[in-house]
Amino acid sequence: MLKKTIDVSKKARYYMLGNPQSNISKVWFVLHGYAMLSEFFIQKFKNLDDGNTLIIAPEALNRFYINDYYSRVGASWMTKEERKTDIEENINYLNLLSKKIFEEIGHTNFKLNILGFSQGGATACRWIFASHMKIDSLVLWASDLPQDTLIEK
């Protein structure tokens, strides 16, 4: 048996609180945990929406049913299957999304903050390390630094 892959285009969804406009002084990317959806996760950050803050909740690219009744759906940033590919696709997705958001804001004079919850924390770390982006703060909520980001290069 021969395993092969093909690149495909996929729509990725994300939710925002606030509008990407010139008065933005703070940007938060908030990455949800395993089996969560960004639509609900972003609700936890409503109090940050002060007119000068933009909150973006990207949703992991892999959705699945989380119960036996097919009534609840969650999303996962990665599993052990094709893990490296999932990580690369997450980084590409987050890079494209952040570039789009920054262009919409129209300036770079804002504080960039990233919060990752659980599995989203590992994804946030990998994104930051792979992208070499400058951030003002990283918040890991119920998460650790992934071992593969601690390897000296």
Can you name each region flagged by the protein language model?
Residues 133-146:
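A conserved short beta-strand
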Residues 123-127, 149:
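Hydrolases whose catalytic domains are alpha/beta-hydrolase-1, hotdog thioesterase
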Residues 115-120, 124:
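Gly/Ala-rich beta-loop-alpha elbow adjacent to hydrolase catalytic centers
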